[in-house]
Curated annotation (Swiss-Prot):
EC nos: 2.4.2.57
GO BP term (any one): AMP catabolic process
Recorded GO MF terms: 1,4-alpha-oligoglucan phosphorylase activity; AMP binding; pentosyltransferase activity
Family statement drawn from the similarity comment of this UniProt entry: Belongs to the thymidine/pyrimidine-nucleoside phosphorylase family. Type 2 subfamily.
Active site: 257
Enzyme class: transferase
Cellular component GO terms held in the UniProt record: cytosol
Matching InterPro entries: AMP_phosphorylase, Glycosyl_Trfase_fam3, Glycosyl_Trfase_fam3_N_dom, Glycosyl_Trfase_fam3_N_dom_sf, Nuc_phospho_transferase, PYNP-like_C_sf, PYNP_C, Pyrmidine_PPase_CS
Binding site for AMP: 169, 195-200, 204, 265, 289
Catalyzed reactions: AMP + phosphate = alpha-D-ribose 1,5-bisphosphate + adenine; CMP + phosphate = cytosine + alpha-D-ribose 1,5-bisphosphate; UMP + phosphate = alpha-D-ribose 1,5-bisphosphate + uracil
Protein name, UniProt field: AMP phosphorylase
Pfam families: Glycos_trans_3N (PF02885), Glycos_transf_3 (PF00591), PYNP_C (PF07831)
Amino acid sequence: MLFLEVKFLDLDLEANAVIINEEDIKGTAYYSQDRVLIESKTCSFIGTLQSTKTMIKPGEVGVSKYIKDVKLNEGEEVRVRHAQKPQSVSYIRKKMNGQTLTADEIHTIIDEIVSKKLTNVELSAFLVSTYIRGMNTEEIVAMTKRMAETGDTIQWEKRPVVDVHSIGGVPGNKYALLTIPIVAAAGMTIPKTSSRAITSAAGTADVLEVITNVNLSCEEIQRVAKTTGGCLAWGGAVNLAPADDIIINVERPLSIDPQPQLLASVMAKKIATGIDYTVIDIPVGYGVKIKNEKEGNQLARKFIELGELLGIRVECVLTYGGQPIGRAIGPALEIKEALMALHDPKSAPNSLIEKSVSLAGVLLELGGRAQIGQGQKVAWEILESGKALEKFNEIVVEQGGTITKPEEIELGEYTMDIRSPKDGYVTGISNKLITKLAKEAGCPKDKKAGIFLGVKTGNKVNKEDILYTIYSSSEERLDAAVNFARRTYPIKVEGMMLKRLSKF
């Protein structure tokens, strides 16, 4: 056992890591990556031990000042000792071997994720095992319920409360910025909680954060939705299904989104936010999570079945995901395009308008605000009339932002136009490569970074026409993005004659 004094560090240390001078552990049974229990007179937490030669003095233990739910004081003496390996580790190994987990075993895994007893390595093992081995319906139900139970829940006076959610995978998927105000303007309650980017260049929360606050508490979500009918908040700012946000932080560098976790993540948040029914958008196409209509139908069936078991009505919509939605990819570019669509929907990209209006139409029909088959028409009328823009501005102001015009959005100061190498037609836009390109430019952390598409699939182009423009706040990032673009060709241009063959 070690007795050390707390030294706060201005570092966000993952897995509750603690840093100890190597002199304090020399000749002991303590090694880097050991799981340790840190105990004070008032609290305790599990951490991962890291050693240093100079960052921390002998006799001190470095602790992140950003660590949550732990009340320590600078200079306070704490005890550091080995912690027992969590029960979850054996259950994770069981799933790695392809076995089915019981509800109690899944509950233990979720509980230990929330209490941060698992290291990122152990959590990664769990995610990869579910990605490869999968889960049956009973396992997913158990995981979903426990994820919701371990956090806060929101109760509503006015019913029904509706929601729309996209499983993502398509660059520029900014539909919610139009769909939510359309539905709210029709008199329905739609409190939307969104994630930040996981595998994409920008999540809805990243995009809206350019012009308003998205870090709302449960009470603020209720207040905004009660006042305006809707809200657009970051789910990670509240304690709704807290295991989900911990898992997302591990999924992000792995660039994976296991289907069992996808199902549980979406539906746990719906339980926690008190949703009566939801519409799930499932993009289908090359380069997204769901490759074809058959896979889309299978996932939709799982969502609907899971909803029935959880008491939430679910309808799924398969949408075209073969190329980016609209022309803007990246937080600032996307909010600019969404604002332009709200101000003048007739001049906005058809893909953005059609998707936003279609999803809103389904919700309006489910909520009785439009007759079956007329929802899309009613949604378009709300958008065209300016009521959706008015409602969007209400939501923005109520969340702490200011009314912003499209031309007021600042974009990255460093830009580069990528031009067509020849005459021809755009035969394809790679969702994956466009997303990677936007990330090379700095997305999502650099909100001014991104890609603006000058063309879409099927467009005729001449040599030297602009295919797309890269934006970044960093000249170095821009150079990296340009080099990536020239190596990978995210947009393909072909002539009518693809290849000439004479003999083999």
